[in-house]
Amino acid sequence: KQLRDNTNVFDWFPGDHPAMPEIVAHRRSPGVDPWIGSCGWCHLPNGKGRPENAAIAGLPVDYFLRQLSDFGNGARKTADPGKKNTAVMSGNAAGLTDEEAHAAAAYFASIKMTPWIKAVETDTVPKTRNSGGFFVPIEGAGTEPIGQRILEVPEDPEAAEVYRNPRSGWIAYVPVGSIKKGEDLVRGGGSGKTMACTACHG
């Protein structure tokens, strides 16, 4: 029961990050209007997020605040009508005070984002089930062709699904040849099909 109680963020490694502001560490008390969930429950105390939401560590404060504003006023939406947590995010953003928004923005901006997704090229992937917006391998179910998908799964399903472990990484299964195609796109625009990513992003 405690593992599913999102009143308080699971902070297994408090030494990995600065002290969390109240809005990052705890949701508002029941009965307080409006109800606001804690930022760290979904995006984790280190801001790395998970496949069902987003990594927000290291985002500039101004950009962070603009995204909150866009979520809150309805300017930012999702292309997937079945993605329920977008509505949760929009409601949270709309209900934040300016003080809470700035505290969260400054906190996550102070944390450096580090890689925790490993790309693995493959022809087959584990059969999976959806667990609240991300995919978890089904034990004993075997594999299936990857096709043209990119499939992200946790390295340790129990650590991610049950304990929300912010140190437990993810595997991104991709079709064979994807990494070279990605490099070509970044460095040369995909054989001239478009602008190289490095032209803007370095």
Q: What residue spans do the PLM features occupy?
A:
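Flexible coil segments in periplasmic/lumen-exposed cytochrome c-class electron-transfer proteins
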Residues: 1-37, 41, 76-187, 192-198
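Cys/His-rich metal-chelating microdomains
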Residues: 45
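Primarily extracytoplasmic ectodomains and periplasmic/lumenal surface modules that are beta-strand-rich
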Residues: 48-49, 63
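Short cysteine/histidine-rich zinc-coordinating motifs and their immediately flanking basic loops
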Residues: 50-56
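Extended intrinsically disordered, low-complexity coil regions enriched in Ser, Thr, Gly, Ala
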Residues: 57-86
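Carbohydrate-interacting regions of secretory-pathway proteins
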Residues: 201
